[in-house]
Swiss-Prot record:
Pfam families: HSP70. Belongs to the heat shock protein 70 family. It comes from Burkholderia multivorans (strain ATCC 17616 / 249). InterPro entries: ATPase_NBD, Chaperone_DnaK, Heat_shock_70_CS, HSP70_C_sf, HSP70_peptide-bd_sf, Hsp_70_fam. This is Chaperone protein DnaK.
Amino acid sequence: MGKIIGIDLGTTNSCVAVMEGNQVKVIENSEGARTTPSIIAYMDDNEVLVGAPAKRQSVTNPKNTLFAVKRLIGRRFEEKEVQKDIGLMPYSIIKADNGDAWVEAHGQKLAPPQVSAEVLRKMKKTAEDYLGEPVTEAVITVPAYFNDSQRQATKDAGRIAGLEVKRIINEPTAAALAFGLDKAEKGDRKIAVYDLGGGTFDVSIIEIADVDGEKQFEVLSTNGDTFLGGEDFDQRIIDYIIGEFKKEQGVDLSKDVLALQRLKEAAEKAKIELSSSQQTEINLPYITADASGPKHLNLKITRAKLEALVEDLVERTIEPCRIAIKDAGVKVSDIDDVILVGGQTRMPKVQEKVKEFFGKEPRRDVNPDEAVAVGAAIQGQVLSGDRKDVLLLDVTPLSLGIETLGGVMTKMISKNTTIPTKHSQVYSTADDNQSAVTIKVYQGEREMAAGNKLLGEFNLEGIPPAPRGVPQIEVTFDIDANGILHVGAKDKATGKENKITIKANSGLSEAEIDQMIKDAEANAAEDHKLRELADSRNQGDALVHSTKKALSEYGDKLDAGEKEKIEAALKSLEDVLKDTSADKAAIDAKVEELGKASQKLGEKMYADMQAQAGAAGAAGAAEGAAQGGAQQAADDVVDAEFKEVKKD
């Protein structure tokens, strides 16, 4: 059985790790980096770029470069958060036939799970290259505050990428696993994980206990905001730059997608720099042009200015911390350690606010970019049965219930209930002789159902005629370890039942997922062909270069016929390499042709080298004899070994 890898599928960056024995390995991607930008670019020639290559070309291809897609996953187009993003993103966010938020690139409509699958495929390939074997199973992390639709959509993304998702695990819980297993402290500890990533914010209160030599991680409570993260901090800087430039130059950059993409890059850099310095300069020449000529942007931003711009965003993270502490039934003073996760927690103002709330310095010994992937890899090892000393007890982040008479939300499972869990309740009909009931399932904390997230609905039909209140309908809610809900309803009189895994009126159908898997496999085959073609071209280029060099050095040792034959083969290989439509077979044939034609040239080179080596050997023997005489005279000299001392 292959290894189960751990993937942190982030809004801004993603990371993959695997356990090797008791050691965790965060795997470098093909560019040599331990994290991969969650950016996907769709090119004119149908090529798909993922990660750093996609990020590099984003300025020149803003409409087809997709980033922060995690903010849309499992969301409806009408949601206010999605509507807010429509005005900010350079790419198109569109309404799918089922009412979900999808994106568009090169006129192609794409579901967020389909786009996220490209990042997951890159993570899968990264792990396969390192392990040297196929990888088919993964643990994927999600924000703790993700609802059922978002979790289901993340699972779908894994399937489209060719991965069996063994478990969906909450990001703060994964970070706690990484932290807890790394520490030798015995006894019970309560920790707070404050996770402020690129697009989402979570806080979880977790108790780590030693139970009979086993480390038990029990999530006491969780809270958060799935639409608050580093991207929002970047946006504040972008808005500020646009405002300042408009005041100075009278030009509104918000309507220029190319300028916006450059501003986004500059804002992110400025934010990062201001975590370690007090001031930074944003310098973007030729940002735009008007009738008077090109315009350049030059602006200084201080750390104090940035803090003023984002003050309310940092403040917004504190209320969920308050609620999480209250829901966990603990006091702030009971918290032993505060762990910071997510790149945005590197901002000094964020650290200061966290310290102020929890009354203690956050731990600095957890890598905020890698801890989540490390925890996912540990959970992968637990699920594969290779690790027995860890028990993870997670919770459902939001209450689940059904709509009952008067539009009321009747809770079946309260938030922060340990999962997996199951709950049944008996309900009855609202009207006389009612033959069917519609069960609408909601997730959220509001008293009225309409204020919560509708996860899905289904009918139980064939109820025998009876006065209202007589039929007994048992509704069962079952949440699995992934936090995904399964619902069943049963008429106790007839035994009729109807079971569903909650699939909102949104989400991808099985047929759509299967089609996306097929498309992905076709793309993978196409990518493989492109890679092989590139390898053949590189081999051809290298052979052209080495043959030309050899001809210039040894060509005069060949007779005219041989030389002409090589030159003709060389020209035909160069011609085929210049032809952009040439396929691998055509290039390989010309490479072979030149290889055969150059055989005589190779023989001449080899003979020449041997002759040179022979001459050098003879000269060496003569020199050795001369040195032998000199050695006799030097016999009374003391030998000493010297070592080079390198100074740091």
